[in-house]
Amino acid sequence: MTSPPSPLDFFWFIPTHGDGSYLGSEEQQRPPEFGYFKQIAQAVDRLGFPGVLLPTGQNCEDSWITATGLATLTEKLKFLVALRPGVTLPTFAARQTAALDRLSNGRLLLNVVVGGNPTELAGDGVFLPHDERYAQAHEFLTIWRGLVSGERVNFDGKYYRVENGRLDLLPSQERPPLYFGGSSDAGQDLAADLVDMYLTWGEPPALVAEKLASARKKAALRGRKLRFGIRLHFIVRETEDEAWRAADRLISHVTDAQIENAQARFLNQMDSVGQRRMAELHGGRRDRLVVSPNLWAGVGLVRGGAGTALVGTPEQVTERIREYQAIGIDTIIGSGYPHLEEAYRVAELLFPRLGLGTRRQQAHRDIANEFSVGFHGAARLQASS
């Protein structure tokens, strides 16, 4: 007998850089407007998603300000917000953390983003090489963790110096959890030392298993345990043909020139090991997009970061998710284009098979029973009249 899958958290995504029905085209695009973010956040809150990721970068609305607004408009939804070592001070970030966690009644999660694009980082005033950014992040998180845990912090390091640092107003949570993704040795060392949830982009299960085993071993050597999550897009439809047609439609406006430019940018302008691994899955070729059963790399032809999607029927996608769970994944951060409609598809088609959103499913059954009783009762009255 196989053991039952471990409990699964299934987060969604707020597209603070804009949204749309097609990649590589301005047709049917949605601008990054707070009203639209509100629609998505309130929908996924009702649908049973426990949380959302808010991205960060020069082309995104600020994740902290956006999350603050959305927290006042939602009930249970958690917000995974970017913590940016090097871009802000750890002491100021700790005060932000405490304030937003209190405002949201303990619904704040932190996504540590060290950055993988030196050009964009230079625009933010960060000029450190790859491994030094992780060394700086280690100092940043050491100070941040101490402050949000209520400690008085004195620290004298290479990148930061703090004397008698403290928070007078602490977070609602004992310490908001730290999420982090980094594929390099320096990134995994940081995760093993200081973070709670180690994230990976959606590579084939065998590659994910290797990465998780490495991070798990590093953490064990430090006497720590990590949880593991994966970042994926989703294209789920009632039939396999519908799902693959939707995938093809998503990139139907992408030109060869756009692919060439995007791949050159990923490989030449970025020093992210994770981004390189994403690009190597398909090599910029349209005929190499199915990189594993139901795992499609079409998104990564032109989109940086998470570049793969699970494509198929609810049964097929559930099977793939169970494979990731079997190697240690207990959290999914999902998305789909456009994000409002695809949130409903995932919740309605996939959640029942994953055993998620059970409260909402029971409400649907209650409504169905009510209509059924009403219909049959009316039929009996009509027959007897």
Swiss-Prot record:
Annotated Gene3D superfamilies: Luciferase-like domain
Catalytic class of the enzyme: oxidoreductase
Keyword Membrane: no
GO biological process: one example: alkanesulfonate catabolic process
Domain of life per record: Bacteria
Function, in words: Catalyzes the desulfonation of aliphatic sulfonates.
Recorded family membership: Belongs to the SsuD family.
PANTHER family, per the entry: ALKANESULFONATE MONOOXYGENASE (PTHR42847), ALKANESULFONATE MONOOXYGENASE-RELATED (PTHR42847:SF4)
Protein name according to UniProt: Alkanesulfonate monooxygenase 2
Species of the source: Mesorhizobium japonicum (strain LMG 29417 / CECT 9101 / MAFF 303099) (Mesorhizobium loti (strain MAFF 303099))
